[in-house]
């Protein structure tokens, strides 16, 4: 992201509470960004990390069209609530409860026909049930994503997303560091 911003002059946008050592816009929940005739709305969806943010794309008519859900919502799963919190004063259960609230108040209130673009698909340690698909819609996720069940209590959700979590991959602290500090450009 640092190299892309440098090459294009585009701003880097992070969610609320993010701390970086490079120039970035720290978006507020609900903050809107205009790009031509479309609008991007930052929806603060903490739980995977405290700065996790979902970006809602509104078309030229102001209609909600898609979400870029990062690691908050995957196709088939949600982001595990422990990877970026080493040393924080929060437990996995605390973060899972925050993630539950984010899903219920920010994402599950959106239209079923909304396109969902997660950060990535299967092959990551970020969740146990990530789909190989890289694009879907919110309605499909309501039917197929265990974490989106409307009858699931907060306590059930916390247990479901925290049971059986393996230790974070050894490389993950480096990922967190690069997100905050940038990286050496090798181009």
Each language-model region and where it sits:
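N-terminal, helix-rich and Lys/Arg-enriched segments in bacterial and organellar proteins
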Residues: 4-14, 55, 66-68, 117-118, ...
